[in-house]
C-alpha cells in the first residue's frame, strides 16, 4: 500500500516554497551551502557595483551590471526554491502523521490488570512504564506493549491500510502505536516511551527534515564541490591582473559572472533537494527511514538477507501430492487425509481437503454428522486428526507420527522414510498420515514461490547484489526452494544467533547487508545490519533496532527499499556529472567574450558565434539559473532507474548526463543569445 502521491508542483506547496526561498536569502541559511554562498556573495557584490554605476560613482554599463546581478539573485532563489519545495513535500506528508495525534486523555490503571481502578489523565503526561486501559472506540494514547487482552486495531492513520489488524498479549503482535484506534474488545498496555519520544513524534521530526544530517556521500560530494569552487575562484582571481597587464582590464561584474558559471552551481543548488526527496520517496513507498544515512546505505547494499516465508514464497503451504505407502492406494490415503483435515481451518488443512476433492471427487463431510471428535494440533503433539467410531486418524510431522506409531505397537515403514526424504529434496514439507498404527502415506505440502521473484533476483544479481534466503526449514528443503527461487545462497535451520553470525561474516568481507525482521529475536541481527527494515506489525524491540520501518509490514519491500536507495545515489551522481560537464560550454561562451579584446586569438573559441560579449556573458548567466529550475523535477522524482551492472550503469549515465551536459548548454546559451538579440535587450 502506498500513500497518496503529491503532484510534483502542487500549487499550495509552490507558493509556500517561494516564500521559503526568499526567507532563505539570509546569510545564515546560505552559509550551509558553500557553493551557493559564493553565488550569494557575488550577487551582493554586483548589486553594489550596479548601484555605484547608476549613481555615477563608478564608470561602466549600469544596465548590464544590473541584469547580471538580477540573474545571480534569481540563481540563488531557484536553488533555495528547489530545497524548499522538497522540504515542503516532506512536511505535507508529515501532516498526515500529525493528524493522528488527537487523543487528549487516557485511563491510567493503578494496577497492571484489567478491572483495576483507573485515573483519567492527560495523554501527554504518560511516562514509560505506566499502564493504561483502552477499549473499543478509544485511540491508543502511547506506544507500548500489550500485557493483557486482545483487540482489533485500525492502523490506517499510520499505515494507510484500511484492513484492521489483531494486537494481543504475548508473541510478536503485542506492539501497539500511539494514535491508532481500537475497533473491538480491550487492551491493557504498558507504555514503552516518554512524551515526545513516541514512534509518531520521531517519525514526524524525521520526515519534516528539521534534524536532517548530511550523509557521508553527501559530505564527500560537498567537499569535492568546495574544492572545485576554490580552484575556479583562484583561477578567476588571477585573470584580472592578466587582463589589466594587457591594457584592457576585465570588469569585476564579468569576473563574478565567469566564476558563477564555472563553479558547480547546478548540483550545488540541487544537492539538498535530492537528499530530502530521497527520504520523501521512501515515505511514498510507506517506509519510514530514521535517517538519510539509512536511505543512502540502501543504495550501497550488496547482500540481501530475505526471509523465505512471505518474501520468497506466498507464506501458505499448499498440498500438492498424495504419496501412498506400499500396499495402500492413493484414494485411501486421500480419504483419510481429508477426514483428518475436515476441522482444520489452517490454509494447509483446507488445501488438503480441496486436493482430495479435486483428485478423487471426495466431498467434504460434516464432522458433527459423523459423530466424530476432532483432535487439534498442539506444539507438544505436533499432530492433528479425527476420531470416528473406532477409527483413529492422525496427520503430522514425521517424528511425531513415528512416535505415535511406535506407542501404538506399530512399525514405521522404511519405504515411507524414503518417500519423506524424496519430498524434502523437492523443496516440499512432508506430512505423514496414519490410521491406528498403520502408516498410509505422505502428503507433500509445497511452498509456492511467488511469481516473478526469480526474475527479480536475476536483476539483483546483474547489479552485483547477492541474495540469501533465511529459513527454519531443513537443508534439503531449503536447498530445493533456493534453487527454484533462484537465490544465490541460503541459511537453513536459522536461529537468531546464526543470522547475526552470518551478517558479521559478510560485513567482515567488506559488504553492506540489508535484512527485514519483526520479532524480538530479530533485534540483534537488525541492530547489526547496515539496512534494517523492521515491520510495523512487529515488536517494539525490532522497531527500535531497525533503521527503517515498513508501515505495510511487507517483507518483500526490502527489494524496493534498495531500488529507492540506488535511485537516490544515481540521481546525485548523474546531476553531478551533468553539472560539471556544463562548465565546458560556459567556458566557450564567456572566456572569448571577456578576454578577446585583450587577446584577439581567443575569438577562435567563440564556436557558438554569439552576438556580442555582453550577450554571451548574460546568456551564460541566464542559462546557469534556468537549468536549476528545469532539473528540479528530476531531482525530486529521481533519474530513471534500470537494474544494470555497475559498468553498464556508468556507461549509460556518462552518455546521457555527460554528453547531455556538454550539448544542452551549447544549445541553450545559443537560443538565449538569439532571443536577447532579436528582442534588442543587449
Swiss-Prot record:
Give the Pfam families listed for this entry: E1-E2_ATPase, Hydrolase
Enzyme Commission number, as recorded: 7.2.2.6
Q: Which InterPro entries match?
A: ATPase_P-typ_cyto_dom_N (IPR023299), ATPase_P-typ_P_site (IPR018303), ATPase_P-typ_TM_dom_sf (IPR023298), ATPase_P-typ_transduc_dom_A_sf (IPR008250), HAD-like_sf (IPR036412), HAD_sf (IPR023214), P-type_ATPase_bsu_IA (IPR006391), P_typ_ATPase (IPR001757)
Q: Kindly give the NCBIfam families that the UniProt entry links to this protein.
A: ATPase_P-type (TIGR01494), kdpB (TIGR01497)
Which compartment or compartments is the protein found in?
Cell inner membrane
Task: Write down what this protein is called.
Answer: Potassium-transporting ATPase ATP-binding subunit
How does the protein associate with the membrane?
A: Multi-pass membrane protein
Give the organism the record lists: Escherichia coli (strain ATCC 8739 / DSM 1576 / NBRC 3972 / NCIMB 8545 / WDCM 00012 / Crooks)
Subunit field text: The system is composed of three essential subunits: KdpA, KdpB and KdpC.
Any GO CC annotation of this UniProt entry? plasma membrane
By its UniProt entry, which PANTHER family does this protein fall under? POTASSIUM-TRANSPORTING ATPASE ATP-BINDING SUBUNIT (PTHR43743:SF1)
- In terms of domain of life, where is this protein from? Bacteria
Amino acid at each position: 500500500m502506498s500513500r497518496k502521491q503529491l503532484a510534483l508542483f502542487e500549487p499550495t506547496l509552490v507558493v509556500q516554497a517561494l516564500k521559503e526561498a526568499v526567507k532563505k536569502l539570509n546569510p545564515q541559511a546560505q552559509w550551509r551551502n558553500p557553493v551557493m554562498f559564493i553565488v550569494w556573495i557575488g550577487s551582493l557584490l554586483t548589486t553594489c557595483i550596479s548601484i555605484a554605476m547608476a549613481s555615477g560613482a563608478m564608470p561602466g554599463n549600469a544596465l548590464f551590471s544590473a541584469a547580471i546581478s538580477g540573474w545571480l539573485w534569481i540563481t540563488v532563489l531557484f536553488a533555495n526554491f528547489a530545497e524548499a519545495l522538497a522540504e515542503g513535500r516532506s512536511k505535507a506528508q508529515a501532516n498526515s502523521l500529525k493528524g493522528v495525534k488527537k487523543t487528549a486523555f487516557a485511563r491510567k490503571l493503578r494496577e497492571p490488570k484489567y478491572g483495576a481502578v483507573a485515573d483519567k489523565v492527560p495523554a501527554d503526561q504518560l511516562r514509560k512504564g505506566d499502564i493504561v486501559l483502552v477499549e473499543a472506540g478509544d485511540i491508543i494514547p502511547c506506544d507500548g506493549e500489550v500485557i493483557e487482552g486482545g483487540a482489533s486495531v485500525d492502523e490506517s492513520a499510520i499505515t494507510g491500510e484500511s484492513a484492521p489488524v489483531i494486537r494481543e498479549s504475548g508473541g510478536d503482535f503485542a506492539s501497539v502505536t500511539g494514535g491508532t484506534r481500537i475497533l473491538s474488545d480491550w487492551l491493557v498496555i504498558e507504555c514503552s516511551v516518554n512524551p515526545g519520544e513516541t514512534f509518531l513524534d520521531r517519525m514526524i521530526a524525521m520526515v519534516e527534515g528539521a534534524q536532517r544530517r548530511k550523509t557521508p556521500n553527501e559530505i564527500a560530494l560537498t567537499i569535492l564541490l568546495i574544492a572545485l569552487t576554490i580552484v575556479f575562484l583562484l583561477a578567476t582571481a588571477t585573470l584580472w591582473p592578466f587582463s589589466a597587464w594587457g591594457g584592457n582590464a576585465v570588469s569585476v561584474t564579468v569576473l563574478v559572472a565567469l566564476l558563477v558559471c564555472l563553479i558547480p552551481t547546478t548540483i550545488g543548488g540541487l544537492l539538498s533537494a535530492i537528499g530530502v526527496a530521497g527520504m520523501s520517496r521512501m515515505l511514498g513507498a510507506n517506509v519510514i527511514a530514521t535517517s538519510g544515512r539509512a536511505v543512502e546505505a540502501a543504495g550501497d547494499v550488496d547482500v540481501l538477507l530475505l526471509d523465505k516465508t512471505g518474501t520468497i514464497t506466498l507464506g501458505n503451504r499448499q498440498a500438492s501430492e498424495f504419496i501412498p505407502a506400499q500396499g495402500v492406494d492413493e484414494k485411501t490415503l486421500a480419504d483419510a487425509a481429508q477426514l483428518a483435515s475436515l476441522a482444520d481451518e489452517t490454509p494447509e488443512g483446507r488445501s488438503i481437503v480441496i486436493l482430495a476433492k479435486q483428485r478423487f471427487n471426495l466431498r467434504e463431510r460434516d464432522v458433527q454428522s459423523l459423530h466424530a471428535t476432532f483432535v487439534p494440533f498442539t506444539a507438544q503433539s505436533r499432530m492433528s486428526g479425527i476420531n470416528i467410531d473406532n477409527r483413529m486418524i492422525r496427520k503430522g510431522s514425521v517424528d511425531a507420527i513415528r512416535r505415535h506409531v511406535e506407542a501404538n505397537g506399530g512399525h514405521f515403514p522404511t519405504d515411507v522414510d524414503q518417500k519423506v526424504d524424496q519430498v524434502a529434496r523437492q523443496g516440499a514439507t512432508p506430512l505423514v498420515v496414519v490410521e491406528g498404527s498403520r502408516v498410509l502415506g505422505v502428503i507433500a505440502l509445497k511452498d509456492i514461490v511467488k511469481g516473478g521473484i526469480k526474475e527479480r533476483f536475476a536483476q539483483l544479481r546483474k547489479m552485483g547484489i547477492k541474495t540469501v534466503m533465511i529459513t527454519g526449514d531443513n537443508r534439503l528443503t531449503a536447498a530445493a526452494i533456493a534453487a527454484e527461487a533462484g537465490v544465490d545462497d541460503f541459511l537453513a535451520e536459522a536461529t537468531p544467533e546464526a543470522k547475526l553470525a552470518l551478517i558479521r561474516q559478510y560485513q567482515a568481507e567488506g559488504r553492506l547487508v540489508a535484512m527485514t525482521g519483526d520479532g524480538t529475536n530479530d533485534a540483534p541481527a537488525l541492530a547489526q545490519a547496515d539496512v534494517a527494515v523492521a515491520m510495523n506489525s512487529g515488536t517494539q524491540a525490532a522497531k527500535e533496532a531497525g533503521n527503517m520501518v515498513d508501515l505495510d509490514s511487507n517483507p518483500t519491500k526490502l527489494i524496493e527499499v534498495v531500488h529507492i536507495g540506488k535511485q537516490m545515489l544515481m540521481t546525485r551522481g548523474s546531476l553531478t556529472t551533468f553539472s560539471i560537464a556544463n562548465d565546458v560550454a560556459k567556458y566557450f561562451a564567456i572566456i572569448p567574450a571577456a578576454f578577446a579584446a585583450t587577446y584577439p586569438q581567443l575569438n577562435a573559441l567563440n564556436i557558438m558565434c554569439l552576438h556580442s560579449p555582453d550577450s554571451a556573458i548574460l546568456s551564460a548567466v541566464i542559462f546557469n539559473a534556468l537549468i536549476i529550475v528545469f532539473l528540479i523535477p528530476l531531482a525530486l522524482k529521481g533519474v530513471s532507474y534500470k537494474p544494470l551492472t555497475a559498468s553498464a550503469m556508468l556507461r549509460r549515465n556518462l552518455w546521457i548526463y555527460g554528453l547531455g551536459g556538454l550539448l544542452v548548454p551549447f544549445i541553450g546559451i545559443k537560443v538565449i543569445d538569439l532571443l536577447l538579440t532579436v528582442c534588442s535587450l543587449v
